[in-house]
Amino acid sequence: MASTAKPVVYVVDDDAAVLGSLRFLLETDGFAVRTFKNGTALLNAAGKSSADCYVIDYKMPDINGIDLATRLRKTDVSAPVILITGYPDENISTRAAAAGVKDVILKPLLDENLIKQIRRAIKGRPS
């Protein structure tokens, strides 16, 4: 990523309202955003281009966020993954960490917390 380029965040959620809100929030804060309505669409795109960070919903109809993160690791090892979920379950957090997920954030999302976690994840990403 060039120093003048906007960091690119890929957001995956099956809820169109969440996608729209996250797109607005992230673009307003200076990120370039691509949204995907399911994990399959992201996997199809991930092989063609890469993100600086992925924000992935845990519960989606085609693939859960942890399995999606595991599959992403095969194509884009260095980009951090942040999992968002409405299910406060320690088992999800443990499984997410084992899959290489950088952080798990509970919905409803606290806007500034999400932005802070994305910036921290991108900053810590290997070059």
PLM regions with names:
Residues D67, P88-D103:
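Alpha4 helix (beta4-alpha4-beta5 surface) of REC/receiver domains from two-component response regulators
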Residues S50-V55, M60:
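Active-site beta3 strand of CheY-like receiver
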Residues L19, P61, D89:
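The feature encodes the CheY-like receiver
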Residues K37-N38, N64-D67:
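Acidic catalytic/metal-coordinating carboxylates
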Residues I66-V77:
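Short amphipathic alpha-helix used as the core "switch/output" element in two-component signaling
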Residues A16-R34:
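Two-component/phosphorelay signaling modules centered on CheY-like receiver
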Residues N91, L109-I118:
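C-terminal output helix
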